[in-house]
Amino acid sequence: MSFPAGIMWRVRRTVVLLHGFTHTGRSWDPVVARLGERYRALAPDIRGHGAAAEARPVSPAECAADVAAAAPESFVLAGYSMGGRLALHVALSHPGRVEALVLVAATPGLADPVEREARAREDAALAEQIEASTIEEFAERWGRNPLFKGQPTEVADAAHADRLRNTTAGLAAALRGLGQGACEPLWGRLGELRMPVVLVVGELPVPRVALAERMAAAIPHADVLVVPATGHAVHLEAPGIVAEAIVQAASAREPAC
């Protein structure tokens, strides 16, 4: 195929967006709206959530395989919180396919086995509470989590509406299979990441900033973006900034035309 002189053909990039616990792919809509026409967004529902609420088993390996099967041969990858942890699994399992990685309020897990075991017990108890609740009851309780304190009303309302797209059985299964207590930590493998990585974190949960900086020190090509006046759910509170971070990360690895 030939083009007139002076006309450049641009490849439309694919961005895969992985949501957090209790959310669905719809939670990324504000970011997708700001990515622009050069990007094709895929925001799947992770096992245990939304349209995939009944998919079993729920494990990092199975969920990573789902992402790899749905995505094109090469893609930009972003994930929030639990979805960020899953994004790490995908990037480490398919390093040649992930062009750039953006992690929003995400960590590689709990390195301390004692802390991880304690978290597993907490998650097991919470999973039982979720199963004993209606989705409306649990969504209301989860929205009061201190992690989300100070969210603008419109952001909190949108997050609540998204949680109602889930089922309690699905969320309980997701917590048991994808919670920090259930997953092996990936701290020791961060050095394997060779693609450009951007770690996005809100400035308000100060421990998260320190964790992001610690992660960046272990990743060969990583930058930390601290977003002022935002909390844990940065992509909901500042979707324009997160979209720009994705664009910048993607630009660092432009495909050949």
Tell where the protein language model's regions lie, with residue ranges.
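Short beta-strand element of the alpha/beta-hydrolase
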Residues: 13-20
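Active-site glycine-rich loops that stabilize anionic/oxyanionic intermediates
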Residues: 20-23, 81
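Active-site loop/oxyanion-hole signature of alpha/beta-hydrolase fold enzymes
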Residues: 3, 29-78, 244-247
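Flexible "cap/lid" loop of the alpha/beta hydrolase fold
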Residues: 92, 99-131
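Short beta-to-alpha linker loops that shape the active-site pocket of alpha/beta-hydrolase fold enzymes
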Residues: 45-50, 107, 230-231
